[in-house]
């Protein structure tokens, strides 16, 4: 028995209705199972939400549009993991509202920047990036050192995040004022940057035999790139 498709193919309204029905069933098949899961992505073991001061810094990061030039997503590519560390996983950003993965890198990825530079370096860099990176085209943010943190607004933000699943306790929220007393937006932004990558999975060291064999085949990054300018006599 042949199927007669003409009554659908020659009637755009009828065809549109059937397309909508088919797409709806496909969407329900994807969405309904998720509604019965308490949490699709589980947090990493021992993972805790960022502190009040770090959250204030994250708010500054969003307000100043830093995500427009910096991503927070290390892709599972060898070139990226060699530079930044372990590739990003969903559990790291399970409490991020909104997520800041980004889509453009005018500047480097920041997903693993925590601990790579000192607080003083970040302070100078945020005030005037060219003081530490002469070729940088990043704008400075000197006003961050003048603006104090609004503890009441931050506490309200933490309560809102708790309704979305971030496990802030009453003690965390009550301690917001003490945690941010006398702190500037510069302090908060630095604290946030230092928190990035805190729970990143660690890269496993290659077995000794494999590492030796690999070193015979491929020069190590250290053998190709001087560790400092002194090594090249500049």
Residue ranges of predicted features:
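Post-cleavage N-terminal segment of exported redox proteins
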Residues: 1-50, 164-169, 190-218, 225-234
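Charged, low-complexity, helix/coiled-coil-prone segments
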Residues: 1-13, 63-73, 95-107
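Electron-transfer interface patches adjacent to heme c in soluble/periplasmic c-type cytochromes
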Residues: 15-24, 82-186, 232
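A generic secondary-structure signal for well-formed alpha-helical elements
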Residues: 32-39, 64-68, 73, 77, ...
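Electrostatic cytochrome c docking/interface patches
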Residues: 38-62, 74-81, 106, 176-179, ...
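The canonical Cys-X-X-Cys-His
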Residues: 57, 63-72, 122, 189, ...
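Surface-exposed patches in mature extracellular/periplasmic domains of secreted proteins
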Residues: 69, 135-140, 200-209
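Low-complexity, proline/glycine-enriched hydrophobic segments characteristic of transmembrane helices
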Residues: 181-182, 219-222
């Amino acid at each position: 028995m042949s199927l007669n498709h003409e009554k659908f193919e020659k009637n755009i309204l009828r065809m549109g209705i059937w397309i909508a029905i088919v797409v709806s069933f496909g969407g329900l098949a994807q969405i309904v199972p998720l509604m019965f899961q308490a949490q699709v992505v589980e947090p990493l073991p021992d993972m805790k939400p960022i502190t009040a001061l770090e959250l204030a810094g994250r708010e500054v990061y969003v307000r100043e549009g830093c995500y427009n030039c910096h991503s927070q997503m290390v892709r599972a590519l060898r070139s990226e993991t060699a530079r930044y560390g372990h590739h990003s996983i969903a559990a790291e950003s399970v409490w991020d509202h909104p997520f800041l993965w980004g889509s453009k890198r005018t500047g480097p990825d920041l997903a693993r920047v925590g601990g790579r530079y000192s607080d003083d370096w970040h302070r100078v860099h945020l005030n005037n990036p060219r003081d530490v990176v002469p070729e940088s085209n990043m704008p400075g943010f000197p006003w961050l050192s003048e603006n104090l943190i609004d503890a009441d607004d931050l506490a309200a933000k933490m309560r809102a995040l708790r309704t979305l699943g971030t496990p802030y306790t009453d003690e965390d929220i009550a301690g917001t004022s003490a945690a941010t007393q006398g702190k500037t937006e510069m302090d908060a932004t630095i604290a946030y940057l230092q928190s990035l990558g805190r729970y990143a999975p660690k890269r496993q060291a290659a077995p000794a035999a494999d590492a030796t064999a690999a070193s015979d085949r491929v020069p190590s990054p250290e053998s190709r790139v001087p560790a400092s300018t002194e090594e090249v006599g500049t």
